[in-house]
Amino acid sequence: MQPWQCLRRFALAWWERTAEGRARSPREEVGPRDPGGRGEPDPERSSPPMLSADDAEYPREYRTLGGGGGGGSGGRRFSNVGLVHTSERRHTVIAAQSLEALSGLQKADADRKRDAFMDHLKSKYPQHALALRGQQDRMREQVGGWTVDPVCLLSSLCSHLHGDSTPSGAGQPAQQPNYWSFKTRSSRHTQGAQPGLADQAAKLSYASAESLETMSEAELPLGFSRMNRFRQSLPLSRSASQTKLRSPGVLFLQFGEETRRVHITHEVSSLDTLHALIAHMFPQKLTMGMLKSPNTAILIKDEARNVFYELEDVRDIQDRSIIKIYRKEPLYAAFPGSHLTNGDLRREMVYASRESSPTRRLNNLSPASHLASSSPPPGLPSGLPSGLPSGSPSRSRLSYAGGRPPSYAGSPVHHAAERLGGAPTGQGVSPSPSAILERRDVKPDEDLAGKAGGMVLVKGEGLYADPYGLLHEGRLSLAAAAETHSHTRARAACTSGVPCALSAPTPLPRCSPTWRTRCTRRALAALYGDGYGFRLPPSSPQKLADVSAPSGGPPPPHSPYSGPPSRGSPVRQSFRKDSGSSSVFAESPGGKARSTGSASTAGAPPSELFPGPGERSLVGFGPPVPAKDTETRERMEAMEKQIASLTGLVQSALLRGSEPETPSEKVEGSNGAATPSAPVCGSGSKSSGATPVSGPPPPSASSTPAGQPTAVSRLQMQLHLRGLQNSASDLRGQLQQLRNVQLQNQESVRALLKPTEADVSMRVSEAARRQEDPLQRQRTLVEEERLRYLNDEELITQQLNDLEKSVEKIQRDVAHNHRLMPGPELEEKALVLKQLGETLTELKAHFPGLQSKMRVVLRVEVEAVKFLKEEPQRLDGLLKRCRGVTDTLAQIRRQVDEGMWPPPNNLLNQSPKKVAAETDFSKGLDFEIPPPSPPLNLHELSGPAEGTPLTPKSTNPTKCLDASSKRNTDKAVSVEAAERDWEEKRAALTQYSAKDINRLLEETQAELLKAIPDLDCASKTHPGPAPTPDHKPPKAPHGQKAAPRTEPSGRRGSDELTVPRYRTEKPSKSPPPPPPRRSFPSSHGLTTTRTGEVVVTSKKDSVFIKKAESEELEVQKPQVKLRRAVSEVVRPASTPPIMASAIKDEDDEERIIAELESGGSSVPPMKVVTPGASRLKAAQGPAGSPDKGKHGKQRTEYMRIQAQQQATKPSKEVSGPNETSSPGSEKPSGSRTSIPVLTSFGARNSSISF
C-alpha cells in the first residue's frame, strides 16, 4: 500500500468516527478489514450467536480485512468478546463532552507533537517526504478541531510507510490484518466505509517502533487500537446532569515515574470515572481492567501529613489533588525472557522482536482479538478466522507489547493470506515487557476470550527466539493457556497465519483435531462470562506447553501467531525451508475437504467438532458463554485467582533455568496430560519454543471430537485444576522432603559437633581453670621471680668475672713490670667491687623469701621425692616390726602353754634394753605416716571385752592356756601359709641398722617409764585417757623445731583390736596395701602385720614391730599429723599424692620449710602398735583421752609379760611354722590377755589381745 493510501484511510477513519457522534461506546474493535470491501458494511457484523449478553445492549462491529483473494473472508465481522466491563461502557457512553473538553485542553500540545513527529518522519524517510507533507496538511484539514494524538496517528503512518519499504511480496499490503487487541464498541449504526485502518494499524507497531527509538516512552501512546488515545466518550461523569461544571479543577496523576496534569471539567463522581480518566492519561500502561484489579491501588496524597492513603471515596478528590496509581510488579518482571504480557496472552498478544526495545513494542495485535467473539459470516469458511482472539481491553499494554522485528515490518503477512486463498493472516502475539512490568502477579482481571488467540505464538521468534516470547519465564496467566478449550477449538478455526519470513510467508497453520483434543483436555477452557462477555481463565505454563505442539503434521515452520524470527535467525531460515511442508486444514465450518495447502496451516476443526448454535463456526474460539452465566463467571474468577499463584509457582519451578530448548516438554510432562510434544499449530502458545522449529512433528494422533463448548471448557478447567493441584502437591512433597533432608543434615552435623564441642569446651575450661588456679598462679609468679633472681645473679657473676680478670691483669703487670698502678684505677676497681658486694648482699637477702615461696610451690614435688627415697626403708622397718611382734607372741604363747612366768625383775631388766632399742629404731625411721581420715571407732571394734578390761588377777591363766591351745591347732595351717607368703614378699627388703633399732628402743623406754606412775589406777574400766604433758613427743635429738601436735585422736585411748574385727578392717587412705589380715596370737613366733602379712619374729624384735603396727594404724587417720622433729633425711609423703589437708595445713608448711632450711627431713614418729593392739574401741570418741585405769591395767600386764619373757628363753629366730595360732582369739576378754604397749609419743595405749 502506498503512503497516500494509508493516509487516506486514516483520515477517512477519523472522519467516520467524528461523524458517528461522541456518545459512541469507546470499545469499538477495529478488526482486520478487507481492503476490497472497504466501504461495504459487513453483513455478519452483529451475528447474535456470538454476542454475549453483555454486548446485546451495545452491539459492536468489527471490520475485518480479509485476505485479498480469499473470497468471502473479506467481510467477516467479529462480535465483541465482551472484554469491557458494563460499568465502563456506561461511563464511556455518557462522557463525550468531557472528552471533548479534555481534547480541547490538549489540542495545542497534540498539534505540536504531531508536527514534530511528521518532521521526524520526513527526515528519517526522505523517499516519502512528499507524501508525508501532503498527508500532514490533509490531516490538519480533516481532523480539524478534533485532537488526534500525533504520535499514535503518525506512528501508524510511519509504520505503514516503513512496511512498504520492506519486501512486501506481491504488493498486497491491504491484506495485513488489524492486530489490535482492544475491542471498541461501535455505534449502533455500521461503519462500513472505514478504509484500510487495519493495515495501518498492523504496520504501526513495527515501523513506528523503529522510527521512534528516540522518543520517550511517556510520549508514545503507540498502537492504540482506535488511532487515538483520547477517547471521544471518555467517562468523566456518571451523573445525568453533565452540564454541571463542578470541576475539581486540576488533578495530578502519578504512575511509576510519570506525572500527568489533568484539567477536569466535570465532577469525578465515581471510581469508574476516575479509572477511565487514569486509563486515558496512561494509555500505554493502564487499562480499566487493570485499574479494577486487586493488584492495583489508587492512592491519594494527604498534604497535611505528606502521606498517601488508599482512595476509597472519590469525594476526597479536590482541586490539585495528587493521585498515585500503584501497580504491583509481577515476579518475573525482571527477566527479559519471553513472558506473556502481564502473564495474559489474551491481554496483549503482540509481536515482540528481540531487536525491538520496550518503547518500540507497539501493539501489533493479532486478529486473535476478534477471533474469540466474532461470529464469522455464514459464507465465510470457518477455518479462516480473520483474526486471533487476543481481545483484551489492555490497549495501552499492547501498544507497548512491541512491534515486529524490523525485518518483519512490512506487510508480508498478506502473502500467507494470499496463499491461503485470501485467508487473513493473523500476526503472532508476544507479551509486552512493559505490560508485564505492570502486572502484579498473574492477574485474574480481564477476559480470556481473546487470549487464546493471543497465545498462538508457536514457533516463531516470539516464542522461540524472541526474548519477549510467550512462555519463557513469565508467569502465564491462566488465560494464556486458556487458549484452552476455546483455544483448541479456535486453534482449529484459526487459519490466519503470519509468514515467518518476508520472502516465504506461510499461512497460519490450523490445529489438528488431536492437538485440539489435547489442548481441550489440558487448557482451562471455561469461557468467562464476566462483564467482558466471555473470558477464558488465565492459562498456566502447562497449557502453553500443550499448545506448543500440534500433532497434525510437520511443525509449522513458522507459527502464524509467533513473532517472525529476525532475518538472520536460523529459525527463520528453517521456516523458509519448511514453509512448503503441507498440513491439513478445514476449509469450511462444515468440515469440507481439508486442503493440504501451504505449510504452516493446520486444519481447523470442522464445525461438527465444536457445533455451536446457529452452525456458527468457532472462529478463533467457540461460541462464547453468555455473560449472564454468572455461575461460570464467578467460579472461573475464583479459580483464576487461586490458580494464578499456583501457575506461577509451578511454572517457575518447571521452567526457571530451562531456556527455550525444553520448557514446553517439561511443562507438558508436569501436567501429565500432554501428548508427546508436537509442533504447535496455529495457536502460538508454544511455550518458549520448546520444540525445535525445524524438527519433524510427532505423528498426529487421531482427532477426538470435543463436546459442547461449555462442557468442554468446564472439563478442561477441572482437568487443568487437577493437574495444578497435583503439581502443587508434588512440589509440596518435594519441599517437605528437602526440609526433612535438611533437618537430618542438621542433626547429623549437630551430632558430629557435639563431641567436638564438648572436647573443646573441656579443654578451654581446663586451661582457664589452670590459669585461675591459685597454686598455678602462685607457681607462675614464683617462677617469674626465680628467673629475675637468676638474671640478677648472672649479671653479678659476669661483672665479678670481669672484675677478677682486670684485677689479675693488674696483679700480673705489677709482678712482671714492677710498675706501680695509678691510684685512681685502683680506686675505680675498689668502687666496682663495692657495688658488686652490695648487689650480691641484696641478692642474698632476697633469696630466703624466694626460697620460702619455692618451698611452698614445690612442696608436692619435694614430698614425692621423699616418698620415692624413703619408701623402701619404711617397708623394711615394717617387716622388722612384724618379725619382732611374731617373736614376742610366740614367746608369750610358749610361756602360757608351759605355765611358766618370768619373775618381774626379769621384765624390768629387759625393758630398758627394749625401750632403748625401740627408741633407736624410731629415730632411724625417716618417714612419717599421715593417719587416714576417719578415726576408727574403738568401741565397735573392741567388742564386749572393752567394757570390762581384765587385770592379770581377774584372768584365770589355766583357762586361758586351755583355750589358746585349742585355737592354735585350728589356725595352724592358715598361719603357716600366711607366714610363707610374708617371707616371700619381704625377702628382698633390707634390715634396719642397729642404730635405728637402738633409737626406737630408747624412745619406747622413755615413754614406758613416763607411764609407770599410773599403775595404781588400773581399776578404771572405761579408758578415756587425755593427753598430758608427759605424753607429748620429745624434741628431736638434733634440736630442730618439732611441729606441734594439736590433733585430738580417738586412738589416744587404748588401741585394742580384737582379732576378728581387725581382720575386716581396711585402711582408709594408706598406700594400697594387700588385703588386711588378722594378727593371730601364737606361742611359736607367728603373727601378721597391719597389712596382713604373717611373719615370724623373735622376742627381741617384738617391741619394734609393736611400734610399726601402731604407726600403720595411724595411717588411717589423716587428720592426725604425726610429726617428728626435723632430721637430715628428706621426709617422704605417706602416699604418693599429698593429702589436701596436709598441703593446706599451716603446721605442715612450717614443717616443710623447716626441713628444707635445715637440708634434712623430719624423722617421722613411729607409733608402735602390736598386731594384738589393733583392736579398736567404738566407744572411744575422736577426742577421747586415755584412761588412767586402763593405763594401769596395761602397764601391769606389760610388766607381767616382760617377767614371763625373761623367765623363758626368748629366741630371736623364728621357730614358727610348727606352731599354731589360737583360733579362739575372738573370745570375750575372759580368755584374752592384753599387753599394753605405749607408743613413742605416749599419747596412745596399744594393747595386744590374744
Curated annotation (Swiss-Prot):
One Pfam family in the UniProt entry: AIP3
Compositionally skewed regions (Basic and acidic residues) per UniProt: 19-45, 437-448, 628-640
Keyword Lipid biosynthesis part of the UniProt annotation: no
PTM info: Tyrosine-phosphorylated in response to EGF and to cell adhesion to integrin ligands.
Record-given protein name: SRC kinase signaling inhibitor 1
Phosphoserine modified-residue sites: 47, 52, 79, 87, 98, 211, 233, 237, 247, 293, 366, 375, 392, 411, 430, 432, 559, 562, 566, 569, 579, 581, 583, 588, 664, 688, 911, 933, 1054, 1110, 1127
Keywords: Cell projection, Coiled coil, Cytoplasm, Cytoskeleton, Exocytosis, Methylation, Phosphoprotein, Synapse
Tissue expression from the record: Expressed predominantly in central nervous system with high levels detected in cortex, cerebellum, midbrain and spinal cord (at protein level). Also expressed in testis and epithelial-rich tissues such as mammary gland, lung and kidney.
GO biological-process terms attached to the record: exocytosis; negative regulation of cell adhesion; negative regulation of protein tyrosine kinase activity; positive regulation of protein tyrosine kinase activity; regulation of cell migration; regulation of dendritic spine morphogenesis; regulation of synapse assembly; substrate adhesion-dependent cell spreading
Record's compositionally biased regions (Pro residues): 552-563, 1069-1078
Function: Acts as a negative regulator of SRC by activating CSK which inhibits SRC activity and downstream signaling, leading to impaired cell spreading and migration. Regulates dendritic spine morphology. Involved in calcium-dependent exocytosis. May play a role in neurotransmitter release or synapse maintenance.
Phosphothreonine PTM sites in chain numbering: 86, 691, 704, 951
